[in-house]
Curated annotation (Swiss-Prot):
Compartments in which it is found: Cell outer membrane
Keywords recorded for this protein, A-Z: Apoptosis, Cell outer membrane, Ion transport, Membrane, Porin, Signal, Transmembrane, Transmembrane beta strand, Transport
NCBIfam families reported in the protein's UniProt record: Omp38Acinit
Organism: Acinetobacter baumannii (strain ATCC 17978 / DSM 105126 / CIP 53.77 / LMG 1025 / NCDC KC755 / 5377)
Gene of this entry: omp38
Topology of the protein relative to the lipid bilayer: Multi-pass membrane protein
Family, per entry: Belongs to the outer membrane OOP (TC 1.B.6) superfamily.
Role of this protein: Porin. Induces apoptosis in human cells through caspases-dependent and AIF-dependent pathways. Purified Omp38 enters the cells and localizes to the mitochondria, which leads to a release of proapoptotic molecules such as cytochrome c and AIF (apoptosis-inducing factor).
Span of the signal peptide: 1-19
The UniProt record lists the keyword Signal: yes
Protein name per its UniProtKB record: Outer membrane protein Omp38
């Protein structure tokens, strides 16, 4: 039962390593020959395993799963068994020896640093758990099985066939700590590496900084929007433009020249004095006065200007007061448009025209 628990624990540890598939080693079959300790098993030592009869040397069979911890250090979980005869006991007497081992090995790469060499000698140290089962052997009160702790020490070599396959040979000594004797095993197997052997990280090479190629700034095309307003106020029953508003009309003409696709919507308004028909004509006349000034004095294309009269329908002040009526006798124009300008490197784009 104890051996089974150790085997299960070993498998649980090894499974994630195999799943990682990087530097994982598998030895699916280890074959060898185990030489049993003759002094311990020939009846010459009190309390030996067989109580007299001698365990015979026999075939060693095993398998191992491991991982390369560094390019020169590895760990393996191993299971093996030996089944042989027992001389001096009843006819057909035999024993079966089982082991679960955890072994570390250090290759010659620790010293040589020759990670691509085809032959890699190694030394091995480890420990494990053993169990002997006996059939046809009279062991008195000791029963038909024996188990305990062991230690392993060995030397060997990996003979690389390619980066994934190596032949493996090893000579190993196993010490039975409970019974105080040594067994010796010569073994060989085929070692498979999943994901390739570990190698030291490549040295960091400092790369000289690359000076960026100077970038010559290029001219940029930008769109400038025009949003402008014009307000002109009139005397009662008049549609002529007072001199004080002519500079404002000139500014509108200038912007219409700067923005060739700009248009103006010109709206005329009146107070509520007089009949409606008269105020409708008067409000339109006031809008047309501003349009005529732009067309006749500044050569603005008439198709870019639209006019409309609203009479007293859209007052902005109280028509009951003199001041309010003066505010309502007006023209209100909105000028909108856009243009594409080319801005040279280092030149700031002009701010959009603000509403006036």
């Amino acid at each position: 039962m104890k051996l089974s628990r150790i085997a299960l624990a070993t498998m649980l540890v090894a499974a994630p390593l195999a799943a990682a598939n990087a530097g994982v080693t598998v030895t699916p079959l280890l074959l060898g020959y185990t030489f049993q300790d003759s002094q311990h098993n020939n009846g010459g030592k009190d309390g030996n395993l067989t109580n007299g009869p001698e365990l015979q040397d026999d075939l060693f069979v095993g398998a191992a799963l491991g991982i390369e911890l560094t390019p020169w250090l590895g760990f393996e979980a191993e299971y093996n068994q030996v089944k042989g005869d027992v001389d001096g006991a009843s006819a057909g007497a035999e024993y079966k020896q089982k082991q679960i081992n955890g072994n570390f090995y250090v290759t010659s790469d620790l010293i040589t640093k020759n990670y691509d060499s085809k032959i890699k000698p190694y030394v091995l140290l480890g420990a494990g758990h053993y169990k002997y089962d006996f059939d046809g052997v009279n062991r008195g009160t000791r029963g038909t099985s024996e188990e305990g702790t062991l230690g392993n020490a060995g030397v060997g070599a990996f003979w690389r066939l390619n980066d994934a396959l190596s032949l493996r040979t090893e000579a190993r000594a196993t010490y039975n700590a409970d019974e105080e004797f040594w067994n010796y095993t010569a073994l060989a197997g085929l070692n498979v590496v999943l994901g390739g052997h570990l190698k030291p990280a490549a040295p960091v090479v400092e790369v000289a900084p690359v000076e960026p190629t100077p970038v010559t700034p290029q001219p940029q095309e930008l769109t400038e929007d025009l949003n402008m307003e014009l307000r002109v106020f009139f005397d009662t029953n008049k549609s002529n433009i007072k001199d004080q508003y002519k500079p404002e009309i000139a500014k509108v003409a200038e912007k219409l020249s700067e923005y060739p696709n700009a248009t103006a919507r010109i709206e005329g308004h009146t107070d509520n004095t007089g009949p409606r028909k008269l105020n409708e004509r008067l409000s339109l006349a006031r809008a047309n006065s501003v349009k005529s000034a732009l067309v006749n004095e500044y050569n603005v294309d008439a198709s870019r200007l639209s006019t409309q009269g609203f009479a007293w329908d859209q007052p902005i002040a109280d028509n009951k007061t003199k001041e309010g009526r003066a505010m309502n006798r007006r023209v209100f124009a909105t000028i909108t448009g856009s243009r594409t300008v080319v801005v040279q490197p280092g030149q700031e784009a002009a701010a959009p025209a603000a509403a006036q």
